[in-house]
Regions:
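ATP-dependent carboxylate activation and anion-phosphoryl transfer catalytic cores
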Residues: 1-201
């Protein structure tokens, strides 16, 4: 684990211990030169990342349970890579949204702030988050496999729902630029244009 992360955890640990804190903890640390800048302490499961963890860490309940007792358990991952994209749904912010999720997507489509009524997924009015309703998750042993799976999943989204792979392409561009500056990545990273949808949707 990078020293910058350890330093922040060491600083917070006494306070968290005093309160017997047993919940999730995530944060942002920006590093420039030798200095680390801490921000965004988050005392909940992180979003994105949690949908990927739910589907890719096979022993997640054990990791959480034993972690709450102070015992570290090594996570076991089903696949090497995961990806998430934001899912949007068109509709009136002041009215309920309703859709039927295809069986093939039920494991991979994470829809917080909604409820299931019979076969329908229902979304209460939400003026805060616009059209964003959740996350689409894909896992794979290569980055290309994750992208290909996501393209197939997007094609299965019900009418009125959409997901955009463009942010993933922007991320691949950042990786490509980092590689040009000599930063090594342990896996082969495809070119950004890989995310272009070619399934006719």
């Amino acid at each position: 684990m990078p020293q910058q992360i350890q330093d922040v955890l060491d600083a917070f640990s006494p306070v968290l211990k005093e309160y017997r804190y047993r919940n999730f903890w995530s944060m942002e640390i920006r590093v420039k030169d030798d200095a680390a800048y801490f921000g965004d302490a988050t005392t909940r499961a992180p979003m994105p990342a949690t949908p990927s963890n739910l589907e890719n860490i096979k022993n997640l309940p054990e990791v959480i349970y034993h972690g709450a007792q102070g015992q570290l358990v090594q996570p076991y991952y089903e696949k090497k890579f995961t990806g998430e994209v934001l899912v949007n749904m068109k509709g009136d912010r002041h009215a309920w949204g309703v859709t039927e999720v295809p069986e093939e997507l039920k494991r991979w489509l994470k829809l917080p702030n909604s409820c299931q009524i019979d076969s329908l997924r229902c979304f209460p009015p939400d003026e805060q988050h616009g059209e964003a309703i959740g996350w689409l998750v894909a896992i794979g042993d290569t980055v290309e496999e994750v992208i290909a799976t996501m393209k197939d999943q997007i094609a299965l989204l019900p009418d009125g729902m959409s997901a955009d792979l463009e942010p993933l392409g922007e991320l691949l561009t950042v990786v490509e630029q980092a590689q040009e500056k000599g930063i090594d990545f342990p896996a082969e990273v495809p070119p950004p244009e890989t995310v272009l949808v070619d399934n006719g949707t």
